[in-house]
Structure formats: structure tokens, C-alpha cells
């Protein structure tokens, strides 16, 4: 019986740790077509430098669409064809922050942008 209680307690602790993962996006705004924006994503609750990170977006009334990814040390990136040459993903592992520089913005880039682990 004592073992069972200990096991349940351990599971509760692990679930609590998992819930501490936070990804907080900032930097959005309204710009004219052709303008630029830089998005940031502040990460906490996990070892940021150990994970590949992604940006995805959701246009109004549409599903989630993958935009870009970067490997753990920032040496490798890839992009959806729709943003290639216009968007640049980067990261600062010392600051636990992911970035998306968006240039030459188009009407079709209008969306809610999310970072993802």
C-alpha cells in the first residue's frame, strides 16, 4: 500500500513538472504589405538548447501550417516554400529565446503564429 501511494505521488510530481513548460510569443503587430516584423518566443521549464524548435501559423478559419524549424544549436534551418527567402528563423540559447524575422510580408502571411517544441 505504501508503494502504491509513493508511485501516485511520483506521477503527480512528474505531471507538475511537465506543466511548467512555457512558450510565450511576442512581437506581432499590424504592418503594411512589404513590411517587416520580428517575432520572439521566450521558453522556460525545459532545456531549451536541447530541442529543435518550430514556428507554425494559423490563418483565420484555417488549420495549423508549419512555417520553419531550427535545430538545437542553430546550425540547421528549413522553411516552408511559401516563406523561403523572406523569413529567417534563429535562436539564442543563452537567452532561451526563439526568433522569426519576417520580411516582405504579404496579405497571405496574416495569421496567428506559434512557436512549438
Swiss-Prot record:
A GO molecular function held by the record: antigen binding
Region (Complementarity-determining-1): 45-52
CC per GO annotation: extracellular region; immunoglobulin complex; plasma membrane
Region (Framework-2): 53-69
Region span, Complementarity-determining-2: 70-77
Compartments reported by the entry: Secreted; Cell membrane
InterPro entries in alphabetical order: Ig-like_dom, Ig-like_dom_sf, Ig-like_fold, Ig_V-set, IgHV
Biological processes annotated in GO: immunoglobulin mediated immune response
Chief location: secreted
UniProt-listed Gene3D superfamilies: Immunoglobulins (2.60.40.10)
Region Framework-3, residue ranges: 78-115
SS bonds (residue pairs): 41-115
Location of the region described as Complementarity-determining-3 in the Swiss-Prot/TrEMBL record: 116-117
Domain called Ig-like: residue spans: 20-117
Entry annotated with the keyword Signal: yes
Signal peptide interval: 1-19
Annotated spans, Framework-1: 20-44
This protein's UniProt keywords: Adaptive immunity, Cell membrane, Disulfide bond, Immunity, Immunoglobulin, Immunoglobulin domain, Membrane, Secreted, Signal
Superkingdom, natural source: Eukaryota
Function, in words: V region of the variable domain of immunoglobulin heavy chains that participates in the antigen recognition. Immunoglobulins, also known as antibodies, are membrane-bound or secreted glycoproteins produced by B lymphocytes. In the recognition phase of humoral immunity, the membrane-bound immunoglobulins serve as receptors which, upon binding of a specific antigen, trigger the clonal expansion and differentiation of B lymphocytes into immunoglobulins-secreting plasma cells.
Assembly and binders: Immunoglobulins are composed of two identical heavy chains and two identical light chains; disulfide-linked.
PANTHER family with a match to the protein in the record: IMMUNOGLOBULIN HEAVY CHAIN
Protein name per the record: Immunoglobulin heavy variable 3-74
Organism: Homo sapiens (Human)
Amino acid at each position: 500500500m505504501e508503494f502504491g501511494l509513493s508511485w501516485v505521488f511520483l506521477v503527480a510530481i512528474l505531471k507538475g513538472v511537465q506543466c511548467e513548460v512555457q512558450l510565450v510569443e511576442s512581437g506581432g503587430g499590424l504592418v503594411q504589405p512589404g513590411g517587416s516584423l520580428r517575432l520572439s518566443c521566450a521558453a522556460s521549464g525545459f532545456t531549451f538548447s536541447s530541442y529543435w524548435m518550430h514556428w507554425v501559423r494559423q490563418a483565420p478559419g484555417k488549420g495549423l501550417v508549419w512555417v520553419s524549424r531550427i535545430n538545437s544549436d542553430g546550425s540547421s534551418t528549413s522553411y516552408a516554400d511559401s516563406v523561403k527567402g523572406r523569413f529567417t528563423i534563429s535562436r539564442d540559447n543563452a537567452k532561451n529565446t526563439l526568433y522569426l524575422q519576417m520580411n516582405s510580408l504579404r496579405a497571405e502571411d496574416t495569421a496567428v503564429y506559434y512557436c512549438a517544441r
